[in-house]
């Protein structure tokens, strides 16, 4: 099996900004992905837990199973999986800050289940697991690795294995034109800004990039649930939280970082509302 090296540097430059900065706009779950506002009156924390539950419920988890979280962030889904679903968990991350906080949070649970975070990429992971979940990590992968990711995921799952991929994706110009959605120079500059200043090396997949490669690896796409407007609302909440903590944010990082993040959060919210970007949970079965 060819050895692929994870892109540690890109992930660490994106996420190893001070945790104190992210704490200013994230909720207590420390989940940095699209929330699911199942009810209009939900707080951001409630909606983040609802999103994690929405994903984990689709995996048909049973107590004692082992769940792999690819790109586990600060461990929010890992903690939820152990506490609510009574499973063993392994979280993979390329970010040292994510790894340290995830490790500490799992150690504080006091479970008899195996619960670990690893500073490791999926490219280096070869153990068998029962289920796989991944929240918005796929859109940081390189297109040339999409098929390999799905093939390796397929290989480490049992015959009744299930994977839940929660990912952003974008559309090609032709589809946008057919839908009457204009792609402007401002949009192109914004995407360039995201790649250079917020998510170095990031490249949004298309829906066919996800579906076609997953099917080529052997997966069946059982269900796709779109969450586009939920992300617009999530981004609004993050932007409001960060704006309210402007002085502290600048003190913790810098005015440039604060301005970049406000531009990113508000700009993404606008583009989700216009339909340029989408996000979905793809339920895959072996």
UniProtKB/Swiss-Prot annotation:
Binding site for S-adenosyl-L-methionine: 32-33, 71-73, 93-98, 122-123
Top-level EC class: transferase
Active site: 268
EC number from the UniProt entry: 2.1.1.-
Function noted in UniProt: Involved in the conversion of a cis-olefin into a trans-olefin with concomitant introduction of an allylic methyl branch at the proximal position of the precursor to both the methoxy and ketomycolic acids. It directly affects the cis- to trans ratio and indirectly affects the keto to methoxy ratio.
NCBIfam families tied to this protein: mycolic_MTase (NF040660)
Family: Belongs to the CFA/CMAS family.
Lineage: superkingdom: Bacteria
UniProt keyword Amino-acid biosynthesis present: no
Transmembrane segments: none
Miscellaneous: Was identified as a high-confidence drug target.
Stretches of the chain forming a coiled coil according to its record: none
S-adenosyl-L-methionine found in the keyword field: yes
Lineage: Bacteria, Bacillati, Actinomycetota, Actinomycetes, Mycobacteriales
Record keywords, A-Z: Lipid biosynthesis, Lipid metabolism, Methyltransferase, S-adenosyl-L-methionine, Transferase
Any one biological process term the GO annotation gives: lipid biosynthetic process
Pathway in which this enzyme or protein is active: Lipid metabolism; mycolic acid biosynthesis
Effects seen without this gene: Disruption of this gene suppresses trans cyclopropanated mycolate without accumulation of trans-unsaturated oxygenated mycolates and shows an increased ability to form cords, thus establishing MmaA1 as a negative regulator of cording in M.tuberculosis.
Protein name (database record): Mycolic acid methyltransferase MmaA1
InterPro entries the record matches: CFA/CMAS, CMAS, CMAS_actinobact, SAM-dependent_MTases_sf
SUPFAM superfamilies for the chain: S-adenosyl-L-methionine-dependent methyltransferases
